[in-house]
Curated annotation (Swiss-Prot):
Keyword Ribonucleoprotein in record: yes
Matches recorded under HAMAP family: Ribosomal_bL35
Presence of the UniProt keyword Ribonucleoprotein in the record: yes
GO CC terms in record: cytosolic large ribosomal subunit
Entry protein name: Large ribosomal subunit protein bL35
GO biological process, one term: translation
Family per similarity comment: Belongs to the bacterial ribosomal protein bL35 family.
GO molecular function, one term: structural constituent of ribosome
PANTHER family for the chain: 54S RIBOSOMAL PROTEIN BL35M, LARGE RIBOSOMAL SUBUNIT PROTEIN BL35M
Gene3D superfamilies according to UniProt: 4.10.410.60
Keyword terms of this UniProt record: Ribonucleoprotein, Ribosomal protein
Amino acid sequence: MTKIKLKTKSSVKKRFHLTAKGKVISTQSGKRHGMVKRSKSNIRNQRGTTILNKSDSRIVKLYMPYGI
């Protein structure tokens, strides 16, 4: 009899990635709308990715049982 495999949450699959050491990477938040109010340097700093802190990454890893 085969074991039931856990499913990965598809919303987490789209938004987060794991590094080789197990850290969780996501894109910077706050870039959808309202850019007129922000300074150019703030907009530039929000490009790219960021590493989640321990408490948030623990929650995200629960939804990615096999890592992606």
